[in-house]
UniProtKB/Swiss-Prot annotation:
Residues 27-117 form the 2Fe-2S ferredoxin-type domain. Its cofactor is [2Fe-2S] cluster. The keyword Iron applies. [2Fe-2S] cluster binds at C62, C67, C70, C100. SUPFAM superfamilies: 2Fe-2S ferredoxin-like. The keyword Electron transport applies. Keywords: 2Fe-2S, Electron transport, Iron, Iron-sulfur, Metal-binding, Transport. This is Ferredoxin-2. GO terms for molecular function: 2 iron, 2 sulfur cluster binding; metal ion binding. Binds 1 [2Fe-2S] cluster. Ferredoxins are iron-sulfur proteins that transfer electrons in a wide variety of metabolic reactions. InterPro entries: 2Fe-2S_ferredoxin-like_sf, 2Fe-2S_ferredoxin-type, 2Fe2S_fd_BS, 2Fe2S_Ferredoxin, Beta-grasp_dom_sf. Belongs to the 2Fe2S plant-type ferredoxin family.
């Protein structure tokens, strides 16, 4: 089971990504279901695919680990990062992963999604329109 929280609500509530009780605060804050909730990840799905299957429109662009539009922070649980991706080691060491190519391997995980406003992540964003023009016949 993945418990998720939208990074954009942190500033509104005076919270920080490093807060130990971040998810307890979110549970008590009466947030919208798109900002805080839970869903299951099927074994063959990435985190992004699972979010979409559950009706959520999380940010992404390339779906291949070449940008940080889909970056998430793993607050609790295990979510290994595949070898091929754009994230520098200092971000992966902080628990940052790309939801388009990774999935939790622990039974439970706490994930903060929508990290595009985090300065270290925003430097590696790509415009989604760059990928919208690609097709399978290209």
């Amino acid at each position: 089971m993945v418990e998720f929280l939208n990074f954009e609500v942190l500033e509104d509530h005076g919270w920080a990504l490093q807060d130990e009780d971040l998810f307890a605060k979110a549970a008590d804050a009466n947030l919208q279901s798109t900002d805080f909730g839970r869903f299951y990840v099927d074994p063959n799905d990435t985190l992004l695919e699972a979010a979409e299957k559950n009706g959520f429109a999380w940010p992404f662009a390339c779906r291949g680990g070449a940008c940080t539009n889909c970056a998430v922070a793993v607050v609790d649980g295990e979510m290994p990062s595949p070898a091929s991706h754009i994230l520098p080691p200092e971000l992966t060491e902080k628990g940052i992963r790309l939801s388009c190519i990774a999935a939790p391997v622990s039974d439970d995980a706490k994930i903060v999604y929508n990290l595009k406003h985090l300065p270290e992540v925003s430097e590696l964003l790509l415009p989604a329109s760059r990928f919208e023009q690609a097709s399978s016949t290209d």
